[in-house]
Amino acid sequence: MMSEDGYNTDFPRNPLYIFFSDFRSVLKFDELGLEIARIALPAALALTADPIASLVDTAFIGQIGPVELAAVGVSIALFNQVSRIAIFPLVSITTSFVAEEDACSSQQDTVRDHKECIEIGINNPTEETIELIPEKHKDSLSDEFKTSSSIFSISKPPAKKRNIPSASSALIIGGVLGLFQAVFLISAAKPLLSFMGVKHDSPMMRPSQRYLSLRSLGAPAVLLSLAAQGVFRGFKDTTTPLFATVIGDVTNIILDPIFIFVFRLGVTGAATAHVISQYLMCGILLWKLMGQVDIFNMSTKHLQFCRFMKNGFLLLMRVIAVTFCVTLSASLAAREGSTSMAAFQVCLQVWLATSLLADGYAVAGQAILASAFAKKDYKRAAATASRVLQLGLVLGFVLAVILGAGLHFGARVFTKDDKVLHLISIGLPFVAGTQPINALAFVFDGVNFGASDFGYAAASLVMVAIVSILCLLFLSSTHGFIGLWFGLTIYMSLRAAVGFWRIGTGTGPWSFLRS
């Protein structure tokens, strides 16, 4: 039986039922559907804004020259790779911890307000005013007296700032990690670039080192911004991060041509524009956050550094496992030759870009689930997991149809080479056909994080990576290009399977499904 809130009030004993519960209501805009949409849509838009801005950024840099474009490309790849190690654990953990603390704090405030109202004789704690004039005399009062009597109404006290220790912890950790990353990349820029294949006598070395060193100055702003985004996600507010992201990206796009062409700063101007935009974005997010959270009035005993570091290490292992699988597949494609690498890169970028849309549902699921688990509202937890997984599956099928048709006719946008186009057509069935599996795998990530099941999420992904690496090595050696895509299909299928197994067996935080 469905409640008006959008979740099933009957609690089945078979955990597998959660995947099929109320599937007919998957697109219904009830209370739960609207809450998911309010979180998922801005989150997906914010996630897609940065890649679009990067494309525009790349277009401006490409006007300087091919050497500068290649140099900046290597520097950006290195910067993003180092950043990813810290970003993913920081944002994921912050979202869950803040959502849990905010839910518990709201419950405590409700109970405290209820007790205070009972003590002063108010039966309904939600009333904003106390009636001072008997009902039977209201009709005889003049309008003037009614107006003047309103001064006796009890007004609401000003809203207090939230006291969320995890928010302060995340910002401190983000700031420290950002400073460490900046020092590391600036001091080790030359050897790191050499490791990436840029030789010391290459014409790319000087512009790539200059760009990386300047870009690294923005690392503290990047990590602080993402920590703040994690806090807002925990509050189920993805609109504020979207606003800050758009402002920052637009600023970057405006400053790029000014610094690059008007001031003739070249690569230096591109890096400077990016750093300015990052600090602007960081400033907006911190300003908005300080209006809602008391981030400074926090004793050290309430900060949760140990909890952050423990779960952060688990997710770090997970990030390394995921990154290694994708990097290995690209490396194996490169060994097949430039034609295979070009086709693989086009297919891979399209394959990964579509995941950003599914990540919107993952963010929504994580925030709502973390709040529900903190309140021990297991019916809402089950309903939320069911709904976001079903929405992810529907999205996957829609993307499969769009990519199946779009990439078939639009592949020439990426290349004119007939050999590359032929290989893209071979990879197309995998890119399009795996979209439902990919979407489920990414949404399962959000579901696991929302349940604070970080240990299982890390351990299962490491096991998946080991099996997938063996499959990639074997299949690429026996079947070449198509073998790589068979291997990646196995990898994503296993990622979805371990998520399905955890909930379907009713183990870990999902044991309530069996009770």
UniProtKB/Swiss-Prot annotation:
It is a multi-pass membrane protein. Expressed in roots, but not in shoots. Detected in the mature regions of the root, extending from above the root-hair region to the root-shoot junction. One of its GO terms (molecular function) is antiporter activity. The chain crosses the membrane at residues 36-56, 59-79, 169-189, 212-232, 243-263, 267-287, 313-333, 350-370, 391-411, 424-444, 454-474, 481-501. Disruption phenotype: No visible phenotype when grown under normal conditions. Strong reduction of aluminum-activated citrate release and small decrease in aluminum tolerance. InterPro entries: DinF-like, MATE_fam. Residues 1-35, 80-168, 233-242, 288-312, 371-390, 445-453, 502-515 are cytoplasmic. The keyword Aminoacyl-tRNA synthetase does not apply. GO terms for cellular component: plasma membrane; root hair. Induction: Up-regulated by aluminum. The STOP1 transcription factor is required for MATE expression. It comes from the Eukaryota. One of its GO terms (biological process) is response to aluminum ion. The keyword Transmembrane helix applies. Citrate transporter critical for aluminum tolerance. Responsible for citrate exudation into the rhizosphere to protect roots from aluminum toxicity. NCBIfam families: matE. This is Protein DETOXIFICATION 42. It comes from Arabidopsis thaliana (Mouse-ear cress). The gene is DTX42.
